Amino acid sequence: IVGTGGDGYKTLNISTATSLVVASHGVKVAKHGNRSVSSLSGSSDVLTELGININIAPELCEECLNETNICFLFAPLFHGSFKHVAKVRAEIKTRTIFNILGPMCNPGNVKNHLIGAYDKLLLHPMIEVLKSLGSEQAWLVHSNDGLDEISISDKTFVHKLSNGQVLEEILEIDKIDVEPSKISEIVGGDARYNAKELFKVLEGEKNPYREITAINSAAALTMCGFCDSIEDGLLLSKESLDNGGALQTLKNLINVSNKLA
């Protein structure tokens, strides 16, 4: 569950929140990510702010995954080339080919993917690459308003891989049970701000951050076959936000990741 980044909107870390919600249902999530390049807070930045140890030795990540249903695979620990270009990427502060490569280079050898792309033109080539790499189920998404995730303010273009076949669909937000909001209402801030707001979502606070987390979580749960429809996925996602399941998953990840330090 990851986005390419580079959409220019600097939203909250939606894929990170989504990963925690999905994992709370027992679905194993190997979250692959890096530090911020063009945004104010990358997935590793906000996870660090939340108290999670992102520098788990690669050989211990599987143990974390088995104990908590989620692990964070910090890209520089697995891909030496990413480490060498990190400084340059941080200096130029714009999207590069690594925004596209990163989401497709998950070292966990995962077979199911929900990936957001910053450009609609990337959906077809990226999902074809995933297909050639042996992925079983995958959704590539890009919203009409430019987000690298499913939007709650406009329709979203979806390329779906299943059973070796790729289908193209459009997800119409007005046909789904979510509260629409403007992009300006899901913009994030620095790592501290994002961590605070993400925690509020996991505590059950009802706001636009919750809505976009819920719809993306619903998509992930549907993509991997845990539920049959986006509507069912929404019910499950909101349930784990309301009953504390997603928050407990975060707490478990904090405890286990630091235990494995």
Model-derived regions, located:
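Short, surface-exposed recognition loops or helix-turn segments adjacent to catalytic cores
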Residues: 32-35, 57-65
